[in-house]
Each structure stands twice: as structure tokens, then as C-alpha cells.
From Swiss-Prot:
Residues 84-427 form the SAM-dependent MTase C5-type domain. GO terms for molecular function: DNA (cytosine-5-)-methyltransferase activity; DNA binding; site-specific DNA-methyltransferase (adenine-specific) activity. This is Type II methyltransferase M1.BsuMI. Its EC number is 2.1.1.37. InterPro entries: C5-Methyltransferase, C5_MeTfrase, SAM-dependent_MTases_sf. Somewhat inhibited by MgCl(2) and spermidine, strongly inhibited by MnCl(2). It comes from Bacillus subtilis (strain 168).
Length: 427
């Protein structure tokens, strides 16, 4: 049953009474996920069971996610007449798109990726390998979407309109350094915050039925006014919206990562506060995500760890010899040892029985965070970082340089989050 409530933005949201939206069962050698749509109809999607041993004691939801992450081949998608045209602005390698793709698979919707744009050439190449967008741009969105809000189309915008034609669902994760909690408050005035207005312009030009924008929680402290202006523009364009900060650790991701989301729609949106109510899971440790990779032998960059200096190798040895997870000040470099600091986790070792810390593009360095493997005397590999970021093995990262792997994986959004948001709204 669905009721209407007034959300924090004084807009109507749909409040759905508690129901089992995701249901899981075993059918032969397959794990089946059945989604109950608002119409009452059920849609099923499958993954192969990893192991038939001890299934009676397994949480089938957890096992489904585990099996999906370990799939080497992309799972089948049932062909239906329902389809959706998706554009991903600031796409990166495609974390948001992957989650929406999986939500479409779960709902029996055919996703078509109409447009993607990103400045990072390596990230966009990964996106293109996995989603084959009809049109993509390895350039700044501002170069092509360059008109003022409310103004007639520019020549460049008309070219984009002619190429892309129709967008039903816009995804956008504008560069967030200007809002990041890792930066001081003065950087919230960063010019990159104005990129939100380019998202507003794309919305104005294409009038999609749905919009999902992602950023760091610090965006709510925006000093430039662009965030407030963005929400006001959604209202003037006739969109309902709701917003939330989600903690990935509580939603099935083996990682402590908080992200801000705003979902907008031409019809009242389902209350985002119900994401935690309907889809929360028990905390999943990193062992859940990467235990099968401990014995993974490979000599390619994706499956090997970074090389470290002799001094950092010695620090890793010290952690294991003394069964420690934090490096004492006495073993740290002078910049930490000789003055007070709050970087307790830096040079640290991951806990095997806990979720990982936030994965960043520094995951290959001992000095960038708690990225030393729990069981092995090395930092985590790109493959392990991808798993922790909820990228399955069938996702094709291609052949990149180590720094490129770290950038595209560390800057991504765990796909589980956009999966849940899209599932909650599109069903």
C-alpha cells in the first residue's frame, strides 16, 4: 500500500508500507531474485549458485550478492518491451550506471545508454567497454552544454540534442573536491561546484522523467549557492525530489562509505528514508568480498599490488610481526612522528572481520590510508579494490596502468547504492 507524505523539502513523497520487495530462492543450480513491482507483478533474475554446500545456513540475499560479484560472464537480461534511455554525466568508469543497469535487469527493463561524458580518458574508455553508449564525449560538459538556464539552445547544445535525441534518466556525479570532507571549508567555493548548473541545463534541455545526482555529504554545506539553486531549478522544472545520505556499510557493501543522493522525478518520488528500512543488511566484512582472491595468482597489474619502498615494506613487516593494525608513531615518518596528528589509520592494516575503510584512489599506497591487506604483506590489488567498490568480475576494466586503475576504481561510486535507489524508484 502507498501513502503520500510531506518530505523535508516540503514536497510530496510516496511512503510505501513495509513489504518484501526483494525475494530470493534457489532453483536448481541458480539463485533467483524476485522483485515485486508496484503493479503487483513479479520479475525474476538469476545468478549461478557459487556452491551447493551448506545452503541451508546461508542468507540467500547475501549469497546472491556474493555470487553476482564473482561472476565472470555478464548475467542474462530478459528481453521486454519496456526500455529506458540513460545518460551519465561525469560518468567515470560507470559505478552509477552499473547499479542502474542491474536495477533494470532486476525489473525486466531494457536499459539503453544514450550518452556519457567524462574528462578522464581512461575512465571513459572503461565506461564504453561496459555500456556501449550511443554517443560519448571525452571533454568538459561545459564546452557543449554552454547556454544559460532559460535561454534558447546554443549551437553546441543543438548538436548534442541532434545526436542524443531522447533521455529518460539522467545520472550525474559532478567532481566533488569542492565539497569533500577531506578538504577545508574554503574549498566549498570551488568553481567545480558550478558544474551542478550544467546538470540543471541538461535537465532543462531533455526533460527526463528521472534524475539521480550523487556527491559527498559535504555538498549540503555548499557556500557557492549552486546546490540551493539546483534544487530550486528542479522545482521550477516541475520535478518532485527527495534527498538522503546513504551509508554503504549498512546496505550490503563491505566498505564504510557515505554518499549524498538526490532523486528527482516528474511524478512523486518514493521516500528515500525507506531505503534503509527496506534494504538494510548486516554489516559485511572485507573477507566476504575478497576472500577468494587471497590465492588468486596473476602477474597482471589488475591482480598484483603496488611495489613499495624499502621503508614502507619494513612498516608492513612490523605490523605483521607485532600483530598490529595501526602503526605506532615510533615507526612513522617524521611528518607524523614529530607532531600531533589525527591520521591513525594511515599506514594501517585492514581488519578481516570488518568492512573496509573508504576506498580512495590512494589504495595502492600505505601512506594514503588503511590499505594494507589483512592477511598478506602488501596493499590491496585493483581487483580487490573493485570488489570492495561492488564491481563484479564481469565488469571489464581493460588494460590500464596502475595509476589509472587506482583513479577509476577509487573515484567510483559503489554500484550497490545506485542499484537500490533505481530499484526503489523505478519498480
Amino acid at each position: 500500500m502507498t501513502n503520500f507524505i510531506l518530505n523535508e523539502n516540503k514536497q510530496l513523497s510516496l511512503a510505501i508500507e513495509d513489504e518484501n520487495i526483494e525475494n530470493f530462492y534457489i532453483d536448481g543450480t541458480d539463485l533467483v531474485r524476485k522483485i515485486i513491482r508496484r503493479s503487483g507483478s513479479g520479475v525474476t533474475s538469476r545468478v549461478p549458485v557459487l556452491s551447493t554446500q551448506d545452503l541451508e545456513n546461508k542468507n540467500l540475499h547475501e549469497l546472491y550478492d556474493e555470487s553476482w560479484l564473482r561472476m565472470k560472464n555478464r548475467p542474462n537480461t530478459e528481453l521486454t518491451t519496456e526500455s529506458i534511455n540513460i545518460a551519465d554525466l561525469f560518468s567515470g568508469c560507470g559505478g552509477l550506471s552499473l547499479g542502474v543497469w542491474e536495477a533494470c535487469r532486476a525489473l525486466g527493463i531494457n536499459p539503453r545508454f544514450s550518452f556519457a561524458c567524462d574528462l578522464n580518458e581512461a575512465a571513459l574508455s572503461v565506461y564504453e567497454k561496459n555500456f556501449s553508449p550511443d554517443f560519448s564525449l571525452n571533454e568538459s560538459i561545459e564546452k557543449h552544454i554552454n547556454g544559460e538556464l532559460g535561454a534558447p539552445l546554443t549551437v553546441e547544445e543543438q548538436r548534442i540534442k541532434d545526436k542524443v535525441k531522447k533521455i529518460d534518466f539522467i545520472l550525474a556525479g559532478p567532481p566533488c573536491q569542492g565539497h569533500s570532507d577531506l578538504n577545508n571549508h574554503t574549498r566549498r567555493k570551488d568553481p567545480r561546484n558550478a558544474l551542478l548548473m550544467r546538470v540543471s541545463r541538461v535537465i532543462e534541455l531533455f526533460q527526463p522523467s528521472s534524475v539521480l545526482v550523487e556527491n559527498v555529504p559535504g555538498i549540503i554545506h555548499d557556500k557557492s549557492g549552486s546546490f540551493k539553486e539546483f534544487k530550486n531549478h528542479l522545482k521550477t522544472q516541475g520535478y518532485y525530489f527527495d534527498e538522503i545520505v546513504l551509508n554503504a556499510e549498512k546496505l550490503g557493501v563491505s566498505q564504510a562509505r557515505r554518499r549524498y543522493f538526490i532523486f528527482a522525478s516528474k511524478t512523486p518520488v518514493s521516500s528515500l528514508n525507506q531505503i534503509n528500512e527496506f534494504y538494510s543488511t548486516n554489516s559485511r566484512p572485507i573477507s566476504w568480498a575478497i576472500s577468494d582472491l587471497v590465492e588468486n595468482v596473476g602477474d597482471d597489474i589488475f591482480n598484483t599490488a603496488s611495489e613499495h619502498s624499502l621503508e614502507n615494506k619494513r612498516r608492513i613487516e612490523y605490523l605483521f610481526e607485532n600483530n598490529l593494525f595501526e602503526l605506532p608513531n615510533s615507526e612513522r615518518p617524521d611528518c607524523h612522528r614529530l607532531k600531533p596528528h589525527s591520521y591513525k589509520s594511515v599506514y594501517g592494516r585492514m581488519y578481516w572481520d570488518r568492512p573496509a575503510p573508504t576506498i580512495t584512489r590512494g589504495f595502492g599506497s600505505t601512506g594514503q590510508g588503511r590499505f594494507v591487506h589483512s592477511l598478506l604483506k602488501r596493499t590491496i590489488t585493483p581487483h580487490e579494490a573493485a570488489r570492495i567498490q561492488f564491481f563484479p568480475d564481469f565488469f571489464n576494466f581493460g588494460d590500464l596502468r596502475r595509476r589509472q586503475y587506482q583513479d577509476v576504481i577509487g573515484n567510483a561510486v559503489p554500484s550497490k547504492l545506485s542499484y537500490l535507489l533505481a530499484l526503489h524508484q523505478l519498480r
